[in-house]
Amino acid sequence: MRVTRFPKIIEFQTHNRCNANCIICPYSSMGYKSEKMEDEIFKKIIDECVDKRITRLIPYLNNEPFLDKTFIQKLSYIRKKLPQVEIEISTNVSFLNENLIIELSKLNITELRLSMFGFTYRMHHIMMPGVDHKKVFENAELIAKYLGNTECKVSIVMIDNKKIPESEFVEMKKFAQKNGFDFCRWGFLDRAKNVKKFSNNYYDDTASGCEQRRPLERMHILADGKVIFCCQDWAHENIMGNIGTDTIESIWVSERYNNYRKCLYSATLDAPEICKRCVLSESCGINGKICN
């Protein structure tokens, strides 16, 4: 188990809200109080990354980033301070518009993931009832228009929860290809049993390791500055520290963080409970079918 002095990737919320109410997501059942990250904490995160060996910033975490009306300005601050860092964004596409997309095209975004969980109106509404189907597809075509000639990798993501007709995937893939996007069909992930309506029916008392190496490479920061052990911790039960009072580096190499890692990666110690519930644990035989 090797851990660098500073995370390679940082994933964080500038706020904690989402409008989509996806049936495959825990968000609507969590009862979160609305939180917005203070500008001071946001700038502290970015400023502490300067001159560090960080490869990617992901300014979203279990939320819809474009609900933040200052999100473009925040992306501009990231790009100004860290001109070489990769920036990844995932969105349900509903709060974009032509002006925002034009501004986005100027920021050298590395990867833009479009969560579009149904091709037809009916299936899209079933999967994402809080999102306007027509607006999403219009915005997707605008993204193709303005980002098509940039270096940004744009992909449409669908989640296969075994309830979606095959024709939905076929037609969405055609739409993606027509617009020059990649198409990703990912397996359903119940977020370590945080999704109420569906389940992977998985629990492993002998969990050891993480298929995606996130505890060794990626830090996750909530809108209030708290650092959680993993993005699957929707209930915020495993807090490693708070960026408001400590530095990224001091939290990352802290005794508490390292104890969690040791418990997860040891064959003899008891893994954190959240990891036992997660199909991305190293010992899970089906994790190769899930990309997330």
For each feature predicted by the language model, list its residue ranges:
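Hydrophobic pocket-lining residues within nucleotide cofactor-binding pockets
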Residues: 94-96, 159, 188-189, 243
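Conserved alpha-helical substructure of the radical SAM core
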Residues: 1-112, 122, 126-134, 138, ...
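Alpha-helix N-cap/loop-to-helix initiation residues
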Residues: 67-68, 97, 162-165, 236
